[in-house]
Amino acid sequence: NKPLQVSVPDPSALTVLASKSHINPETKKYIEKYSISNSKNAGSSLKFCLIAAGEADLYPRLGRTMEWDTAAGQAILLGAGGHVTNLSTKEPLYYGKPGFENPFFIAHSDKGIIKN
C-alpha cells in the first residue's frame, strides 16, 4: 500500500467532483470558471477521498452541510496534502461553529487552482 497523496493538477484539464443529489445552479456556475476535462459524481466523504488519492482535483460544495458530514473526509484530504477552503473567506474550513453548519467550501488538491 502506498500513502495517499493529492495529484499535481493541470489547470487546463481538471477533474471536478459533484454531489449526486445536490448539484444546484450556484455549483454549476462556479464549475464553469474552470477548464474541466472530467466530471465525476460521488457521494458524501468519498469526494474528499478521491482528491486525497489523486483521482480528482476539485470539489465545490455550495450547499448545506454539517460538520459531521465533512470532518472525516477533510482529515483524510489534509493528511494527503489537500485543502478545504471556506468559499467566502478563503480561509481553511474550521470546526466547532455554533449550530455546526458549514459555510460553502471548496475541497481541492492545490491552492493555485482556486478561482474567486
What are these regions (language model features)?
Residues 16, 50-52, 71-78:
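Hydrophobic residues within well-ordered alpha-helices
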Residues 1-48, 97-116:
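Acidic beta-strand-loop-alpha-helix segment within the catalytic core
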Residues 68:
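Acidic donor-binding loop at a coil-to-helix junction in glycosyltransferase catalytic cores
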Residues 53-58, 81-83:
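Alpha-to-beta junction loops
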Residues 36, 61-62:
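A generic structural signal for short
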Residues 82-98:
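Acidic, metal-binding active-site segment of PIN/NYN-like and related structure-specific nucleases
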Residues 20, 63-65, 87-90:
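Short secondary-structure boundary segments
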